[in-house]
């Protein structure tokens, strides 16, 4: 049986992460530990033309109608997609964010208060740790495997010992493990 990694911990990761990300800017360093391709590989001229063409056709009201909780038609389509997979969710229950990290931050802000304990998969993507640090949360690491996902035994042990307010998981294409959590 696997066990939670140590006890809960207050985080101090942002400075270290920013040092690593800053090193990516040094052209003498090959960033093997990050997913940033060489900037010279980007077709910037072509991307610029595509963006300019898209901007010419942009509905001026989109800057207002697409504000949170999101574009109404997109929310309807997402609700239909959930329904096709067996989950009945109304469009009013869906909030569209500009990315996974904004969604994670909103969820953690809604569910926790500074000093609360959350469980995270280990290893995990650093930005989730930064969000936890910024919100003043403590974390307990739960071992995860790319084939089997989070150790349910370790999670149960942690839940029996501590009051866990939220559980942070990356269920599909986990970073850094690359796995998809089984059903």
Identify the meaning behind each predicted range.
Residues 1-52, 76:
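N-terminal basic, amphipathic alpha-helical segments
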């Amino acid at each position: 049986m696997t066990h939670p990694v140590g006890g809960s911990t207050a985080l101090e990761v942002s400075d270290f992460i920013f040092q690593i990300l800053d090193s990516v800017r040094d052209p003498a360093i090959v960033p093997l530990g990050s997913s940033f391709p060489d900037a010279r590989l980007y077709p910037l001229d072509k991307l610029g033309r595509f963006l300019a063409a898209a901007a010419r056709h942009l509905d001026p009201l989109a800057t207002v109608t697409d504000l949170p909780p999101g574009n109404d038609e997109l929310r309807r389509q997402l609700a239909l997609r959930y329904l096709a997979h067996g989950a009945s969710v109304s469009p009013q229950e869906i909030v569209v964010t500009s990315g996974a990290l904004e969604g994670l931050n909103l969820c953690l802000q809604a569910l926790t208060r500074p000093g609360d304990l959350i469980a995270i998969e280990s290893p995990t993507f650093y930005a989730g740790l930064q969000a936890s640090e910024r919100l003043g949360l403590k974390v307990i690491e739960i071992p995860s495997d790319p084939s089997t996902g989070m150790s349910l035994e370790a999670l149960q042990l942690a839940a029996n010992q501590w009051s866990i307010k939220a559980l942070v998981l990356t269920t599909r294409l986990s970073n850094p493990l690359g796995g998809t959590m089984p059903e």
